[in-house]
């Protein structure tokens, strides 16, 4: 994302339009980009930013417009609007008391040729809990999640799983494994493959009725006959999550699940994910840079830096990370 944005800015065009440029950026990268855009605006450039991460955008802009219900309205009070769209979402789930591990990572490392991505990761993912991975862009969070999902194999170390002993510790991932382990990719385009939303959500669902129930939860039933690739990024994200949730996995791996969501949609998504978590007792593992919802998805948090777990904690670690 940084590469594409930098390439666009390097063209020297005087009118710059950016659609969700901060979607997957960590807080420092987002601040650097907005400072650059502010400098360009000061030099006479016209900069238009379409973005949902308003906490990162509003301090740098001159004018704000809200688009909704087919209308474009100018926002006069930026501070008031910021508060209404960025208030942290509360976590209404009971305090998690479990300590039995579902995944036990021991000295896990991963390299690609000469590039070392993860050096020495050791941590336990609690069964039935909600774990959040924090860290800057490029620190290896997505790689770590893919290792847990058995999409990659560690270069060194061991990841023990306690989902079901029949899967063993070295067994290759198969259809039965992914019935238990649901993966939400960072880019929904990578996992949407059916010709309609109905078929996408129903593909692995427990039943057609349950697929419809989940679609209603996520507010996508009206898109039932649409092709998934014809949808907006926010709609694609909701469809991709609904399709995996409809399979009732025991483990839900979410890589930047809130990309493209407005505040109302984000609140609804958190409500649904946590409600299903309470109902099913699933284990959730999330990567996010979204300060609005990180605490609402967290019982346990790990901060990844320089290829190792630099810090671990709970919601207090999430607050420390975003405050810093």
Across the structure, where does each feature detected by a protein language model lie?
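ABC ATPase NBD Q-loop/coupling interface
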Residues: 158-176
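Catalytic Walker B motif of ABC-type/P-loop ATPase nucleotide-binding domains
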Residues: 16-19, 252-255
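H-loop/switch region of ABC-family ATPase nucleotide-binding domains
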Residues: 51-52, 288-289
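The feature captures the beta-strand-to-loop junction immediately N-terminal to the Walker
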Residues: 134-136
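Helix-to-loop junction immediately C-terminal to a conserved catalytic motif
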Residues: 149
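Conserved ABC ATPase signature
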Residues: 227-231, 235
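Conserved ABC ATPase "signature" region
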Residues: 208-223
């Amino acid at each position: 994302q940084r590469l594409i944005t930098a390439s666009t800015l390097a063209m020297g065009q005087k009118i710059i339009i950016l659609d969700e440029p901060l979607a997957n950026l960590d807080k420092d990268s987002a601040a650097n980009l907005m400072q650059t855009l502010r400098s360009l605006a000061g030099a006479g450039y016209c900069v238009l930013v379409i973005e949902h991460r308003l906490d990162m955008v509003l301090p740098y802009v001159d004018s704000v417009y809200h688009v909704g219900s087919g209308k474009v309205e100018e926002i006069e009070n930026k501070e008031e609007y910021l508060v209404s769209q960025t208030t942290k979402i509360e976590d209404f789930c009971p305090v998690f008391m479990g300590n039995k591990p579902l995944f036990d990572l021991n000295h896990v490392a991963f390299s690609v040729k000469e590039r070392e991505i993860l050096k020495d990761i050791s941590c336990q993912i609690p069964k039935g809990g909600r774990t959040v991975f924090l860290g800057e862009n490029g620190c290896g969070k997505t790689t770590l999640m893919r290792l847990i999902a058995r999409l990659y194999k560690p270069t060194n170390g061991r990841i023990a799983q306690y989902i079901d002993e029949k899967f063993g510790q070295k067994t290759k991932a198969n259809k039965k494994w992914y019935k238990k382990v649901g993966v939400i990719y960072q880019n929904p385009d990578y996992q949407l493959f059916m010709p309609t939303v109905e078929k996408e959500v129903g593909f692995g669902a427990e039943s057609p009725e349950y697929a419809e129930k989940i679609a209603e939860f996520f507010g996508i039933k009206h898109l039932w006959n649409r092709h998934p690739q014809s949808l907006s990024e926010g709609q694609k994200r909701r469809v991709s999550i609904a399709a995996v949730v409809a399979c009732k996995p025991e483990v839900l791996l979410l890589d930047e699940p809130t990309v493209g969501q407005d505040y109302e949609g984000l609140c609804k998504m958190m409500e649904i994910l946590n409600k299903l978590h309470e109902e099913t007792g699933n284990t959730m593992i999330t990567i996010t840079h979204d300060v609005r919802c990180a605490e609402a998805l967290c019982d346990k948090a790990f901060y990844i830096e320089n290829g190792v777990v630099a810090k671990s904690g709970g919601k207090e670690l999430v607050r420390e990370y975003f405050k810093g």
